[in-house]
């Protein structure tokens, strides 16, 4: 056995850690079959069993697991180039393609309603009504803006039952991709903790959210928070190419909705947490979640402002 990563699972976020590990193990086994058949070329996160042959163990109310370390690799926090965006998006596309014949319903929903925008909007309104820490008076502009975007909820509802449920990664950030330190190629898709049944539009939208802005998601330089068109074009090409044999036309068209929904939804979640007293997302200072919300709303506005160009890139892919 080589180097191992020992990890404590966050049971506040994942109240049923054994289900999380079971999901990840199912995906690991499926990908190993695909790799052996030459249908998946990336490295695979491998769970290491304990001496008693368990893949997670409890020690004093904490749940731990061990994963095989993937060497000669590095991660990125901000996308540096269109080439890098295409490489990462292609890896996430290969991951999705390898799982297209995996039963999405065999995955346990470890975080219920994770990408349920209607529920996220309801949670925001509950936070407004409770006004636990007296912050509602300071965010009327943001609240008005959120309420004006209700059409996104309606558009998602209209899609229900018309596009297939897929096994999704649900956290397709650039830092959940490992690059080779030798040639900058894609090495592995990591962090399978949120793998659940979902829609590919959410994975696409999360890449838009985390790849396209040149600024970090808590940057207060809102005039610089914008969608870099070359990065967007690269991720569209990279993600869709491996999926061409599997994706429906309606699914591909839904990616435009995903590009809008994901920055808006995480903005709603940051704003909700700000009004609730910062209980979910870790903060570095009192206004941190509000700054994050403003940042994500600025990114959403940038997506919408560039609709004509960005939508065409998806349609023509």
Feature-to-residue mapping (PLM):
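Long, compositionally biased intrinsically disordered regions
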Residues: 303-307
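A short, acidic/glycine-rich surface segment
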Residues: 52-57, 154-155, 271
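Active-site activation/catalytic loop segments of kinase-like enzymes and analogous catalytic loops
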Residues: 201-245, 261-280
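ATP-dependent phospho-/nucleotidyl transfer catalytic cores
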Residues: 7, 14-18, 70-86, 101-169, ...
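Small/polar glycine-rich anion-binding or flexible loop at a beta-alpha turn
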Residues: 252-262
């Amino acid at each position: 056995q080589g180097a191992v990563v020992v990890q404590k699972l966050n049971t506040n976020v994942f109240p049923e850690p054994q289900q999380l590990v079971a999901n990840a193990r199912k995906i690991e086994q499926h990908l190993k079959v695909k790799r052996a058949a030459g249908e998946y070329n990336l490295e695979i996160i491998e769970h290491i069993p304990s001496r008693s042959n368990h893949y997670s163990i409890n020690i004093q109310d904490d749940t731990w697991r061990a994963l095989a370390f993937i060497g000669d690799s590095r991660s990125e926090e901000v996308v540096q180039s269109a080439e890098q965006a295409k490489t990462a998006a292609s890896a996430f596309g290969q991951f999705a393609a390898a799982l297209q014949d995996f039963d999405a319903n065999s995955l346990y929903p470890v975080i219920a309603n994770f990408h349920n925008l209607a529920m996220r909007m309801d949670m925001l309104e509950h936070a407004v009504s409770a006004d636990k820490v007296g912050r509602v008076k300071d965010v009327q502009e943001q609240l008005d803006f959120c309420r004006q975007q209700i059409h996104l909820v309606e558009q998602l509802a209209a899609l229900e039952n018309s596009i297939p449920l897929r096994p999704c990664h649900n956290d397709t950030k650039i830092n959940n991709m490992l690059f080779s330190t030798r040639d900058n190629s894609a090495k592995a898709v990591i962090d399978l903790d949120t793998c659940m049944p979902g829609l590919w539009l959410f994975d696409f939208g999360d890449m838009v959210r985390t790849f396209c802005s040149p600024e970090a998601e808590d940057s207060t330089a809102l005039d610089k928070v914008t969608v870099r068109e070359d990065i967007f074009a690269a991720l569209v090409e990279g993600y869709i190419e491996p999926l061409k044999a599997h994706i429906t036309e309606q699914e591909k068209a839904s990616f435009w909705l995903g590009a809008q929904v994901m920055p808006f939804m995480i903005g709603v979640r940051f704003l909700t947490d700000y009004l609730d007293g910062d209980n979910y997302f870790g903060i570095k200072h009192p206004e941190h979640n509000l700054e994050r919300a403003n940042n994500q709303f600025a990114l959403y506005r940038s997506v919408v402002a560039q609709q004509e160009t960005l939508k065409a890139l998806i349609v023509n892919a």
